[in-house]
Amino acid sequence: METKIIKIDQDNLDHKLMQEAGDLIAAGELVAFPTETVYGLGGDALDPEASKKIYSAKGRPSDNPLIVHISDFSDLERIAKTVPEDARKLSDAFWPGPLTMIVEKGDAVPYATTGGMDTVAVRMPNHPIALDLIRRSGCLIAAPSANTSGRPSPTEAAHVAEDLSGKIAMIIDGGPVGIGIESTIIDLTEDTPMVLRPGYITPQMLSKVLGKEVVIDPGIIAADDTRKPKAPGMKYKHYAPKADMVIVDGTRKHVIAKINELVASHRDDGKKIAVIATEETKQFYDADVVLSMGSRADEDSIAHELYRILRDCDELDVDVIFSESFSTPRIGQAIMNRMLKAAGHQVIDTHVKYDKIIFVAQTGTCREQMAKGIMNDFVLKVPMEIEARGLVVQFPEPVNQKAEAVLISNGISTEDMVSTQLEESDITETTMVFTMESSQRERIIESFADIDPEQVFVLSQYVGDELEILDPYGGTLQSYGLCYESLRATLKKLVKRLNANT
């Protein structure tokens, strides 16, 4: 089969060419097209023969469900057995967009499309070419990513051509995609909504719209290959480059040292090595190929570049890839989900085993002392020394009287609470430092040149809270009480995270 490639400007659609593409879908053929996430491989979702062609062209296991792409909410009502109220709320908030919802399937959807499941995955893409193609075809379009199964997903038409030329009727070249990782998938068939695949839309965003808890499938990060997949990407090795890939996790200093050690040992074996890094770290690596995902602060860039870089490694014919990890605050879980699958869950953990926590604020007499007292009230799986320090301490002072009153009223002793100046010698390689405010973290890093910045955290940011712990100084006793409650809630999250990592 000869694959026709057409170029379409998404801002100025060529209606004749788009109709040609739509007619191919209607005739049972396959057409690759851009979406806002990755390129999709489309066929008539209600035609079992078209779905079989998709599986065949990709080399995709037939129990791996396909996502049905629609152009109007009424299409969901056509193919779902029932439409949950949660689906209506989420569609109002996020469609068209990178969100796939799993609902019970209606009789119109063949099992060939759902991988034998009684559920169907549905989304409305936010891309003018994709939406126009659905409408012109007169079909609902089943579309997984347009790549050979197991390879990195395509973010530009050239990637599709590399994998699928000669296997499908047409490729619509609409330029590079915007997001670069697949849609979030949420299962709405159970009482509690569950994210089965992380993406650009986070569980927190979903929970806010629904007004209730949204849980995360524990298999998202785990190497679990035993369950029948309810959504794409839950089973089988995914997104993988041809080279063996290993992720190195830990603080920046330890990751760089470990990767360079691995590069040296593999170079001795005559292997061509690539390192996946960031703009901030790329200059520290001595490898044959060093590829940057962009700035670590730019999560969108990291997501957008991931699949392109994995394909670049294939083109450069490297033998081994060592990559930094990318557990960024907002969509880091989605990025790491893809990276772990690409690496076959091969991870080297270089994290230091911390044995001490220092809480730091300004004077050493208030929030940091409350944090110390509260933290000692919790149980850590691995005991740690808990200290409190101030950034500006002229002489030892007892804890603030109002803070003391609040602590005592909550059954926490203040007997040994005296302000102490933070010194560089307090911070060893196995110390975690938590500040109450971003400015305090910056001051510590500026003052102590020899400490690792990755050991110093803003407490609220570390646990995923948006607001910093407010300073109650000068306020009423009630203000100190509110500060205590805020600290306790935040520290409960800290303990949960620390215990999960032990």
Q: Across the structure, where does each feature detected by a protein language model lie?
A:
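Active-site-adjacent structural elements in enzyme catalytic cores
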Residues: 1-352
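Hydrophobic packing residues within well-ordered alpha-helices of enzyme cores
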Residues: 54, 76-79, 160, 206, ...
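Short, well-ordered alpha-helices that flank and scaffold nucleotide-derived cofactor binding pockets
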Residues: 56, 162, 337, 341, ...
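Short helix-capping segments at alpha-helix termini
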Residues: 61, 267-268, 377-384, 448-452
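A short, structured active-site edge motif that brings together acidic residues
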Residues: 66, 71, 388-393, 456, ...
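S-adenosyl-L-methionine/SAH cofactor-binding core of RNA-modifying enzymes
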Residues: 256-266, 273-277, 409-410, 414-430, ...
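Conserved active-site segments centered on acidic
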Residues: 352-429, 496-502
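Phosphate-binding/catalytic loops
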Residues: 432, 442-502
